Amino acid sequence: MLFNAVHNSLPPNIDIDHAILRGEDHPPTCAKCVARGRISALGSLDLRYHSLRCYAAPPDVGRCEFVPPRRRVLIANQGLDVSRLPPTGTVTLLLADVEESTHLWQMCPEDMATAIAHLDHTVSEAITNHGGVQPVKRYEGDSFVAAFTRASDAAACALDLQRTSLAPIRLRIGLHTGEVQLRDELYVGPTINRTARLRDLAHGGQVVLSAATGDLVTGRLPADAWLVDLGRHPLRGLPRPEWVMQLCHPDIREKFPPLRTAKSSPTSILPAQFTTFVGRRAQIS
């Protein structure tokens, strides 16, 4: 224990340096040395414990629901709901887009405008009903992203979206679980990239999951839902292939063409190994 180590190494009534964070969004901890403050180490064991404890990080630091104190104050001043903030840490991302969106907009722009408005309402309602959060209304084009602290909630939300009539729109949905980072209220990093590549594998009306998410939802799926193993597939631009699963339910389509895996293509027109022509005049003449 930190307290025991400090108590056993120091005599009573001496000063101890403790790190204090000032003007930061993170709570003070003894490991950070941003600004120095001094407290007196009292002789009483109980007083020492409480003195040191006031510098320790709150027990919920590191959880995806944790919101730094300073940010909570700013949120409260603006009248925002803390529960609707994008979660960080380990979360399950749901990333979806409209299949053949560009073609649909060109062929029937008025119908698509109505369908997109209906989609926005349906997506917002489904995400809220399952405890998810949308960092932004739109991610890229007609795609959207939602974050869930529980993988089972993300799977239930994806299933509800596919069971809802959105014609002429058909959604391609990918689910993946991992560590996420927020930058300007947008998720960045490997997890969002892998989720996007998973979504790109899917067809309209299909929900695909990574192995990480599949493991978490096994035994926790909505009633009558099940998973189908689609095997291991490469993901465009990523070095590690992914074991892909499909979320199935009697109310949604089950059979699809093979996943949209990127076809391998040469990355260079140069030979794999250079050939020297020095001393080979006879052969090349």
Swiss-Prot record:
GO-annotated biological processes: cyclic nucleotide biosynthetic process; intracellular signal transduction
Span of domain Guanylate cyclase: 92-199
Any Pfam family hit: Guanylate_cyc
CDD domains: CHD (cd07302)
Name of protein: Uncharacterized protein Mb0915c
Organism: Mycobacterium bovis (strain ATCC BAA-935 / AF2122/97)
Matching PANTHER family: ADENYLATE CYCLASE, TERMINAL-DIFFERENTIATION SPECIFIC, ADENYLATE CYCLASE, TERMINAL-DIFFERENTIATION SPECIFIC-RELATED
InterPro entries recorded: A/G_cyclase, Adenylyl/Guanylyl_Cyclase_3/4, Nucleotide_cyclase
Protein family (similarity comment): Belongs to the adenylyl cyclase class-4/guanylyl cyclase family.
Organism ancestry: Bacteria, Bacillati, Actinomycetota, Actinomycetes, Mycobacteriales
